Amino acid sequence: MTQKLLYVSPVESFVDTSFFQELSRLKLDIHGLSTSQITIHSYLDLKNIPSVSSACHLFLDQQSFNSEDICASSERVRLEGKLYNCNSLEEFKSLDKQQYLAEQGQKIYTKALEDINSAIGFSIISFADLKKYVFYYWVCTPLFQHENQQISILDGPEDIDASFNDKAKVWFTNHYSNWVAIVLENGDINEYTKGLNTSSIRGLLIRDTSNKQDMPSAFLRNFITIFSLDYPEAKELDVFLMRSSTIKSIKLRIRLSETEHTKLKFSGWERNSLSKLMPRAVDLSALIDPLKVAEQSVDLNLKLMKWRIAPELDLDCIRNNKVLILGSGTLGCYTARSLMAWGCRNITLVDNGRVSYSNPVRQPLFEFSDVGKEKAVAAAASLKRVFPLINAKGVQLDIPMIGHPVKDENNERKHFDALVDLIKSHDTMFLLLDSRETRWLPTLLGKFYDKIVMNAALGFDSYLIMKHGNIDDNFGCYFCNDVVVPTDSLTGRTLDQMCTVTRPGVAMLAASQAVELFVSNLQSRGQENVLGECPHQIRGFVNNFTTLKLQSPAYDNCSACSRHILNEYNKRGWDFVKQALNDNNYIEELSGLRRIKEEVENMELEGGEIKIIDSEDDGFEII
């Protein structure tokens, strides 16, 4: 009888783009620098095999990382595998591929000695360049065979008769997780087991993934190797290759050569599109929706912080925090960009002005083409041009100012209600306005509604950053060191007083430190945290390049955050605000500042000594 060697059809893989997207997410968010192998799953669609393919594809997609997402059936078989993701391209290149294949093959072989249905699996080595969105990978399906063993075809291939074919289909439908069964001499199909009488075995029934009429799948070698160990006396047997595709199921009569079961040899690396034994590379930057690429890429540097430098950093609390920026000028623009860099996704900007010709060179969210546009709206549009998926809104709004009497109550009441709604719907408020009286009402509302308030103010060569607002905090607000109530400081200003006259770098310093203080505060709500300290105030001086960390307590007679003011606002709402705007003496009387001034004056008349702390100087504890 003429014998010919058995040739097999290699396994092919198909890796969907969603697989790499999920891999990049897991690498960034969970695995970090870990190179431990992770378990993944694939499925083989035995029925729908492309006509141009030599075998059904080992399909990998996003669901491969969660076994529960892959449903198995008689025609859709689930397969377990391993993924080894390298930390650098150099590590990927230098990895001993043959040793890795042998190690994975040995593990599968060991499992198969206990259960022949575990004789097949797969492994992937990869490197994900998350900056360029290029993925390098190589798939292997470890195949093993004893070095001196040969498998010869004695007869066939020939078609399986219809009655046995139907019986085999029913058996695999009822045992869809099995790959192999034993066919007895009487034609019965039994689940594979060891210890049967060799003379009672006619052959093996194997689920076949090949799409070639006269050639079985490469997995056959693994099954035959295990069978030859379990039944060493069986030298000839029939192999029934069951197929679910349009290709007919076939039968082969094979012979196993006389050999000692010595060392195993391993193969199984997949060839690339040029039929070379080489890894593949796929550049997804041009294939995936650019918005999806941007969504993952904008947080890349932040997530890399968690790998080694700050593993406990909470990025979600920053991402989900809704930030309201009052003032869309120089401070507002730099603050918004810094918030974006920290991953903040919800930013609302408020202003009542329009972009002037002097703005674009100092305020980075504006260009020459924006001149004349509403500042807040133009700034929000600029943020969306930088990152289209950010939830940025611009609101044109006049904030009612203490010391400026109400002229159009309906209009000012409408702006007041809008401001209250904005503050209530956000978590944090940045006060970046250009006058003290404009900051008074937002400071009051921030304290009343228990919001985080980040305050920043500029001088010519100095700046102040402070956090306040939360009811639980006993720190002073922007007005707690004032002994006078804010009044109209805008009327009668000269040009140099109407414009922000400050050294250009001061705004960048103030905005960046305000955002850093905000982020540190979110990590611990006031205590030392993974990012370091979280001071109450920061005062910077560019003339001598020094910075002071300061702390001052809340003032019982503060014109903005004292209980007298908050209680009255709680009772009267807009009527209270209207009276405060119209009557310069009302807040001074209500807060108790008038009484304190009178007591001071009386002490001076009586010859006593008292030192009045100026609101612009000391009164702080240096920490």
Curated annotation (Swiss-Prot):
State if Transport is listed as a keyword: yes
The Gene Ontology terms for molecular function here are: Atg12 activating enzyme activity; Atg8 activating enzyme activity; identical protein binding
InterPro entries in UniProt = Atg7 (IPR006285), Atg7_N (IPR032197), Atg7_N_1 (IPR042522), Atg7_N_2 (IPR042523), ThiF/MoeB/HesA (IPR045886), ThiF_NAD_FAD-bd (IPR000594), Ubiquitin-activating_enz (IPR035985)
Which Pfam families does the UniProt entry name for this protein? ATG7_N (PF16420), ThiF (PF00899)
Q: Where is the active site?
A: 499 (glycyl thioester intermediate)
Question: What biological process terms from GO does the record include?
Answer: autophagosome assembly; autophagy of mitochondrion; cellular response to nitrogen starvation; cytoplasm to vacuole targeting by the Cvt pathway; piecemeal microautophagy of the nucleus; protein modification by small protein conjugation
Q: Which domain of life is it from?
A: Eukaryota
Q: What is known of its domains?
A: The GxGxxG motif is important for the function, possibly through binding with ATP.
Q: How does it assemble?
A: Homodimer.
Entry's PANTHER family? UBIQUITIN-ACTIVATING ENZYME E1 (PTHR10953), UBIQUITIN-LIKE MODIFIER-ACTIVATING ENZYME ATG7 (PTHR10953:SF3)
> What is known about what this protein does?
E1-like activating enzyme involved in the 2 ubiquitin-like systems required for cytoplasm to vacuole transport (Cvt) and autophagy. Activates ATG12 for its conjugation with ATG5 and ATG8 for its conjugation with phosphatidylethanolamine. Both systems are needed for the ATG8 association to Cvt vesicles and autophagosomes membranes. Autophagy is essential for maintenance of amino acid levels and protein synthesis under nitrogen starvation.
What's the protein name?
Ubiquitin-like modifier-activating enzyme ATG7
Which organism is this entry from?
Candida glabrata (strain ATCC 2001 / BCRC 20586 / JCM 3761 / NBRC 0622 / NRRL Y-65 / CBS 138)
Its ancestry begins with:
Eukaryota, Fungi, Dikarya, Ascomycota, Saccharomycotina
